[in-house]
A protein has these predicted regions:
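Short active-site loop at a secondary-structure junction
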Residues: 48, 63-81, 96-97
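Active-site SXXK
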Residues: 74-91, 110
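Structured C-terminal helix/loop/strand segments within mature extracytoplasmic catalytic/sensor domains
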Residues: 231-353
């Protein structure tokens, strides 16, 4: 179900909004552009469409490709913003557990144990969670679960840390728990107000994300602006606490071998978050930021396009070679690759066959 957002509680709105908020982005068919080519043997075999925005430290658009102003769903790329909202509402998490609250985790034992710990601190249990039961997101972890005959679990589902943190935030404020995922719940009203505050625009639509939580529609430009405000915030603020926790505990926010964790390790000071359906956002401490949406949701395009966007933002390309794109195989040997279009990456990070 998709709905136009209701007017937020005035008290919550006043508490959460710290800057002017523009009108909601238009709900329209996005005017995506080619962002990556599938090159095999020197021939363009396929094209991935999408949109890219690169922001300077002062918030101005340095580069754009496609449609950066249409309403879209950031999916899990919005989790750092949701975590900021919970800290603003009194959630006392820090360190690896705060990183887990903003995670799309792989379902490793450390993620499950961390989620249990958040619930214990809140005086709650797994049965209080309302996210959907699922197998672990990480392929290797999921395979081991299947071999062991383990069943889908709310704790293993990749958003469980966020849901545990939402429950604790609700409990701390005396809000009801059973309906914490209702968009009209005070917790979700606080999240919506923080989304609007950090993106600088009204929410266009509210629907339900895969985990069951409300999902807020903003623009790609707004998503980049939000992460820039998080990474450039003053020390000690909720924004700075979220950014610091996710950077310091990158694998807690994702998992072993995940590209977003590797990207944060490779680029000093970078905060990065991915989302289903080909979404990526990343920002540096000075406020430079990028956001990417791949129209067909392909991760094979998301990673190299995000790397090329970071190079456009001024990141040393030598730090990004690991993210230049997976090879295309022919007969078991590399014969090409997925490469950002020339408009985005005039000097490709890697050669294609």
């Amino acid at each position: 179900m998709t709905r136009v957002p209701a007017a937020p509680d005035p008290m919550i709105q006043a508490m959460m909004h710290s800057s002017p908020v523009a009108d909601a982005p238009l709900v329209r068919e996005p005017l995506h552009a080619p962002v990556a080519h599938l090159v095999r043997g020197g021939i363009i075999e396929g094209i991935h469409y999408g949109s890219v925005v690169v922001l300077d430290a002062d918030g101005r658009v340095r580069f754009q490709l496609g449609d950066i102003e249409a309403a879209f769903y950031p999916r899990s790329a919005l989790k750092p913003v949701q975590a900021v909202a919970m800290l603003r509402a009194g959630l006392p998490l820090e360190g690896e557990l705060l990183s887990l609250a903003a995670a799309s985790h792989s379902g490793e034992e450390r993620h499950i144990a961390g989620t249990r710990r958040i619930l214990e601190l809140a005086g709650l249990a797994e049965d209080d969670l309302r996210n959907v039961p699922d197998m672990p997101f990480g392929a290797a972890v999921r395979d081991s679960w299947i071999r062991a005959g383990r069943l889908p679990s709310r704790l293993a589902q990749n958003c469980s840390g966020k849901h545990a943190a939402m429950l604790w935030t609700a409990a701390l404020n005396g809000w009801t728990l059973k309906d914490y995922l209702d968009p009209a719940h005070p917790l979700q009203q606080a999240v919506a107000a923080t989304v609007e505050d950090l993106t600088g625009q009204r929410v266009a639509r509210v629907t339900v994300d895969g985990c069951g939580a409300p999902l807020f529609s903003v623009s790609l430009h707004g998503l980049a602006r939000a992460l820039a405000r998080i990474t450039s915030a003053e020390p000690g603020t909720p924004e700075a606490r979220v950014a610091g926790a996710m950077r310091e505990h990158a694998e807690m926010a994702s998992g072993s071998g995940r590209d977003v964790a590797a990207l944060m390790r490779a680029v000093p000071g970078l905060l990065a978050k991915d989302g289903f359906e080909g979404v990526q956002v990343a920002a540096l401490p000075d406020g430079r930021a990028v956001a990417v949406k791949i129209a067909d949701g392909a991760d094979r395009a998301r990673v190299p396009v995000a790397a090329a966007a970071l190079a456009r933002a001024g990141v040393d390309p030598a730090l990004l070679t690991e993210f230049a794109g997976e090879p295309l195989l022919g007969g078991g040997e590399p014969v090409g690759c997925v490469r950002p279009v020339r408009a985005l990456d005039p000097v490709p990070l890697t050669a294609c066959g």
